[in-house]
Regions:
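N-terminal beta1-alpha1-beta2 submodule of the flavodoxin-like/Rossmannoid cofactor-binding fold
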Residues: 1-111, 158-160, 164-196
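Short, glycine-/small-residue-rich phosphate/pyrophosphate-handling segment
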Residues: 95-97, 110-156
Length: 196
């Protein structure tokens, strides 16, 4: 069992990264292996919204025309048994680099999750708010909407903040160990929340 951890922070020693490391520790304790991808170390361009309708080969072929590091990460996602998306919270939303990545991801998976391999893959979202903490639940909601659109089976969304960080580290380790059992949400495959 392998989990891919996608880190949307540029601080390898920050709270978001530390939380992701705790989850990885639990996953490995549960018998799995992990790989962490730090988006800040990679070249990922923003979506170009190809063609007049804003869709290009992402819609027709489930891949992106842009030549950068996105395709390599997408291939790793398709091979993973579980995917963890860990992001700091900026203005009650995803970090800019996580938003750029997930914007591209939802384009290549929308209505094609079964074909491209993301359908039903267990996923966890982790959203770390360093300020007041009020933005973490909103960020989790936004991340959940994107991941459901991509076809993932959302098994947990975990908001956390600096005020409860030490407690949540224990939760992350336990959650990682649980994730190694390949849990499911119980929702039907391909369930999406309505996009308004």
């Amino acid at each position: 069992m392998k989990a891919l951890i996608i880190l949307g922070s540029n601080n390898p020693e920050g709270r978001t990264a530390t939380g992701a490391k705790a989850l990885a520790k639990g996953f490995e304790k549960g018998g799995g292996t992990t790989e962490t991808i730090m988006l800040s170390k990679l070249n990922i361009e923003r979506c170009r919204q190809c063609e007049l309708a804003g869709w290009g080969i992402c819609q027709s072929e489930g891949r992106c025309i842009i030549v950068d590091d996105f395709a390599g990460i997408f291939e790793k996602i398709k091979k993973a048994d579980a995917v963890v998306f860990a992001t700091p919270v900026y203005f009650a939303d995803l970090s800019d680099m996580m938003r750029t990545f997930t914007d591209r991801l939802r384009r290549v998976t929308f209505r094609k999750a079964e074909k491209v391999g993301t359908q039903g893959v267990p996923a966890i979202g982790m959203c770390m708010s360093g300020g007041s903490g009020f933005g973490a639940p909103s960020c989790c909601y936004n991340l959940e909407r994107v991941l459901l659109t991509c076809g993932f089976d959302i098994v947990d969304m975990i908001p956390f903040r600096r005020q409860n960080f030490d407690t949540k580290l224990k939760v992350f380790e336990i959650t990682g160990e649980w994730l190694a059992t390949k849990p499911t949400s119980g929702n039907p495959p391909g369930m999406q929340i309505p996009i308004r």
